[in-house]
Amino acid sequence: MSKVYDWFEERLEIQTIADDITSKYVPPHVNIFYCLGGITLTCFLVQVATGFAMTFYYRPTVTEAFASVQYIMTEANFGWLIRSVHRWSASMMVLMMILHVFRVYLTGGFKKPRELTWVTGVVLGVLTASFGVTGYSLPWDQIGYWAVKIVTGVPEAIPVIGSPLVELLRGSASVGQSTLTRFYSLHTFVLPLLTAVFMLMHFPMIRKQGISGPL
């Protein structure tokens, strides 16, 4: 086993990377509230894993979506547990994200030179809220349907571009199959991809600039 490790160590310098990660200075004022961002990341990873598992059974059509969710909850092996964990971690992710934003703001973590870290964090917050809106509709039950109808109807109040924007969100003049397809694509592909991209921007900046000092 040591020979295998030595082979990788010689080529990748694993120990050097590990030492760099574990030797990062942590200021003495850091407490449990500074872990909220990491908890949000953990919830996101749980979301990815459980969401991926449900794609094997979920059917994004207006005629089969609700029945497929029922199948996940009642017949698929551990489906009830996977979906329940997905829902619980979704709520936890939103809560932790909100608390994380408050913690950063109250401790001045948005100030120079961390402005870009703050901006990417705000974008991640918007993406998190978007996950909630798009995911809420996927069971296509009465709650999901009317939630989509209300949310997608909000931009209609905007002068000139309101109606075209509503049609863009819905995929047609009314809520239907095109709307569900759009929301499913956003929830399972577009939003996770954008979230991963902004996380890959967010974390290196935190790593480079370190944790902000006490007020």
From Swiss-Prot:
PANTHER family: CYTOCHROME B (PTHR19271:SF16)
Cofactor note: Binds 2 heme b groups non-covalently with two histidine residues as axial ligands.
UniProt xrefs under SUPFAM superfamilies: Transmembrane di-heme cytochromes
Transmembrane segments: 32-52, 90-110, 116-136, 186-206
Disulfide partners: none
Other comment: Heme 1 (or BH or b566) is high-potential and absorbs at about 566 nm, and heme 2 (or BL or b562) is low-potential and absorbs at about 562 nm.
Needed co-factor(s): heme b; heme c
Annotated positions binding heme b 2: H86, H187
Heme recorded as keyword: yes
Compartments, record wording: Plastid, Chloroplast thylakoid membrane
Entry keyword set: Chloroplast, Electron transport, Heme, Iron, Membrane, Metal-binding, Photosynthesis, Plastid, Thylakoid, Transmembrane, Transmembrane helix, Transport
Annotated heme b 1 binding sites: H100, H202
Membrane topology: Multi-pass membrane protein
GO biological-process terms attached to the record: photosynthesis; respiratory electron transport chain
Function of the molecule: Component of the cytochrome b6-f complex, which mediates electron transfer between photosystem II (PSII) and photosystem I (PSI), cyclic electron flow around PSI, and state transitions.
A Pfam family assignment: Cytochrome_B
Alphabetized HAMAP family for the sequence: Cytb6_f_cytb6
Ribosomal protein found in the keyword field: no
A GO cellular component annotation in the UniProt record: chloroplast thylakoid membrane
Protein name stated in the entry: Cytochrome b6
Binding site for heme c: C35
Subunit structure: The 4 large subunits of the cytochrome b6-f complex are cytochrome b6, subunit IV (17 kDa polypeptide, PetD), cytochrome f and the Rieske protein, while the 4 small subunits are PetG, PetL, PetM and PetN. The complex functions as a dimer.
Any GO MF annotation of the entry: oxidoreductase activity
Principal cellular location given in the protein's record: plastid
